[in-house]
C-alpha cells in the first residue's frame, strides 16, 4: 500500500501532476499508463519495486526512511 497523501504532496512539491509523472516514468523506461498509475494510487493494484525506484528518483526522494514512509505503509 502507498501513502497517497505523502506521494501526492511530494509530486506537487517537485512540480509534477499524475500526467507529467507518468510521462517522465515512461521516458525513463518504466512503461505505464495514466489508468494504471491511477489504479495504483487508489489501491486497486500495487506499485512494484521498479515503479518505486523511478518515482523516488524523479521526485528526488533519497532517504530510505522517506521511501519506506511512502511505499511501505
What is the role of each PLM region?
Residues 24-27, 59-61:
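A short, basic/aromatic helix-end/turn motif that makes direct DNA contacts
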Residues 43-57:
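Short, basic-rich loop-to-helix N-cap that marks the start of a DNA-contacting helix
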Residues 22, 38, 67-68:
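Key DNA-contacting residues within the recognition helix of helix-turn-helix
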Residues 49, 59-73:
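Short C-terminal boundary/hinge segments that cap the last helix of small helical domains
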Residues 18, 34, 52:
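Helix-turn-helix DNA-binding elements, focusing on the entry/boundary residues of the two helices
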Residues 1-18, 22-24:
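A short, Lys/Arg-rich alpha-helix, primarily the initiator
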Residues 27-46:
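Recognition helix of helix-turn-helix/homeodomain-like DNA-binding domains
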Amino acid at each position: 500500500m502507498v501513502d497517497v497523501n505523502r506521494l501526492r504532496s511530494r509530486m506537487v512539491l517537485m512540480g509534477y501532476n499524475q500526467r507529467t509523472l507518468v510521462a517522465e516514468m515512461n521516458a525513463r523506461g518504466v512503461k505505464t499508463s495514466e489508468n494504471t498509475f491511477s489504479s495504483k494510487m487508489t489501491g486497486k493494484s500495487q506499485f512494484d519495486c521498479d515503479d518505486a525506484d523511478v518515482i523516488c528518483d524523479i521526485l528526488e526522494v533519497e532517504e530510505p526512511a522517506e521511501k519506506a514512509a511512502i511505499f511501505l505503509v
